[in-house]
UniProtKB/Swiss-Prot annotation:
Annotated gene: copD
GO biological process, one term: copper ion transport
InterPro entries registered for this protein in UniProt: CopC/D, CopD, Cu-R_CopD_dom
Biological function: Exact function not known. Involved in copper resistance. Appears to be involved in copper uptake in conjunction with CopC.
Species annotation: Pseudomonas syringae pv. tomato
Induction behaviour: By copper.
Similarity annotation: Belongs to the CopD family.
Protein name: Copper resistance protein D
Location(s), subcellular: Cell inner membrane
PANTHER family: INNER MEMBRANE PROTEIN YEBZ
Principal location listed in the UniProt entry: membrane
Amino acid sequence: MEDPLSIAVRFALYTDLMMLFGLALFGLYSLRGAERRSGAVLPFRPLLSATALIGLLLSVVSIVLMAKAMSGASEWLEAVPHAEMMVTQTELGTAWLIRMAALVGAAVTIAFNLRVPMASLLMVSLLGGVALATLAWTGHGAMDEGSRRFWHFSADILHLWSSGGWFGALVAFALMLRPNKVETLQSVQVLSRTLSGFERAGAVIVAFIVLSGVVNYLFIVGPQVSGVVESTYGVLLLGKLALFGLMVGLASANRFVLSPAFERAVHRGEYARAARSIRYSMALELGAAVLVLGLIAWLGTLSPEMEAGM
């Protein structure tokens, strides 16, 4: 089994960068005007600053861990020279440098959110998207060559972006649904509008996740299912698909049942119970998303071909 610490760092990095990208993107397509200013609806500045800085720290730990594993070094300090060599002499190192630059840029840009909220969120979403895309170089696509490599990377990056968009929206709704945030009519109206507005964006995101996920499966495993479920990779993949199905089911319940009920309750001025129902549903969906990210981090360290040959 892969080093649990490496899997944990991968999981933390996936979660952090998806939150950075997805939360900034949510502010662009769901909020309006002054609502994009930190503190008006969501705490953009402290939250995105923290995720950018944590992303920098996790990236440093990640590259040293990879160098330690590849070099066979027994001590952390012994792995540092190997990490420096990886950064300066490999494609993975180039992707890592791009990620670090993007995260520094995001940390600087979000500081201007109170002055230029829309521009700052736009820049953070772009830089966060670049940082998130670099994780593709730590996945299975890095082992391909030629045109296959290009298309595998494209599918990987699309999967990362669409997953980040969904995860960021879930985090945003979780923050907006906190009990102290649904006390005023204005905040409840913003919540109702963003829930309704996310219906179309959510459908597009799910479509991209399914499309890119199928393409990734074909690149990694091929057009077959027999034998895959007998491996650790297959079991984890089935778990991921089951959790994804649960998330789609909860999202459908939110769209077709809970959100319309909440909107009607807002018009009547009786929204406490409806908000509580959506809060529980979103908490389950966010919890499932976190588990999915954990499985993604683990799956990225496994090779179904190698397991099949064992």
